[in-house]
Amino acid sequence: EDITSRVELGPRFRLPVPSHQVDRGTLENHMLKLSREKGNTVLLGSKVSNVEILPDSLHEISFIKDSEEQKVNCKWVADASGRASILKRKFQFQKPMEHHSNAVWWRLKGVIDVDDWTDKKDWQSYLEPGLRYLSTVHFMDTGYWLWVIPLGSKNTSIGIVADPAVHPFETYNTYEKAVEWMKVNEPL
């Protein structure tokens, strides 16, 4: 089996509105730089342990940095804790979901262009030249989907989203395991 036997969905021609994928790491570094230029203090390598939202005064954030608990006060709080979901858990904003999934992702240096995965000219010419490279490509099968996203930084984002009832998280929860998982499930 090669890539040309897979189902392909998406536009055959470029869309009238130009767009591109944002490299999240590049964006985050840029935002960090802008924040520091505005005089904000950014504490990398810290872990928030508690947030107190105080309606009539500055909010209080407790965090651990270098094994020491510290506190700061601030006017605004934005939860960027990822899966820890500090504010969502504290204020019980979570809602039960019927669909459960886990995800892993990473970036590879360099460009992955799925057009290069076959020499079949009829498949390559089915879409406007370069269109697959400008797209988020998803490979789907029972209980999972895998993405390949070319980034403006000339790197590629790869990710796996899977139902734990079909693909236990422990089988792909590290880079090394994810590569082995792909060899079994997506040998293309």
Model-derived regions: residue spans:
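Conserved N-terminal/central alpha/beta ligand/cofactor-binding core
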Residues: 1-47
